[in-house]
């Protein structure tokens, strides 16, 4: 681990089974299926942001994001966030999501009502891998949610 890397949170299975996540970068929201765990110790995930996506610019600017695992009952709003552009509209306000301060992140806020949340900071961008997607290794710096797997209602894909 490089000296400038943050202390990562302990691994958590709050996201199992694999599911569609709702990502926040700053105050912007987007649904994401292109993610996976790449390390348990240190706890890291891989995110793939579409090239040209407004959230990609925000991720490069803020170097942080949050990954939310929303209940099945929120699936319509989560999916709808992918049809709106954060360049033109405040998605949280338009879709009725409540944003809360993060524990460790400076500019990115958290979505109320998530069954689990991972606070993430950029470890590195993987360059020259894809023309369509920008892959990022993200360090998990905080984990929220302790709902047992049998009590969760995930948005599976």
Q: For the regions a protein language model found, what residue spans apply to each?
A:
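Basic, polyanion-binding surface patches
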Residues: 1-157
């Amino acid at each position: 681990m490089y000296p400038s890397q943050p202390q990562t949170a302990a691994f958590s299975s709050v996201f199992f089974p694999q599911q569609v996540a709702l990502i926040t970068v700053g105050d912007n929201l987007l649904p994401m299926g292109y993610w996976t765990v790449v390390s348990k110790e240190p706890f890291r995930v891989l995110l793939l942001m579409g090239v040209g996506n407004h959230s990609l610019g925000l991720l490069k600017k803020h170097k942080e994001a949050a990954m939310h695992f929303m209940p099945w009952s929120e699936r319509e709003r989560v999916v709808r966030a992918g049809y709106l552009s954060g360049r033109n509209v405040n998605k949280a306000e338009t879709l009725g999501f409540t944003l809360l301060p993060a524990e460790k992140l400076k500019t990115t806020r958290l979505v109320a009502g998530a069954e689990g949340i991972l606070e993430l900071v950029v470890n590195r961008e993987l360059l020259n891998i894809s023309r369509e997607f920008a892959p990022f290794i993200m360090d998990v710096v905080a984990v929220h949610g302790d709902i047992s797997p049998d009590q969760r209602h995930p948005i599976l894909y």
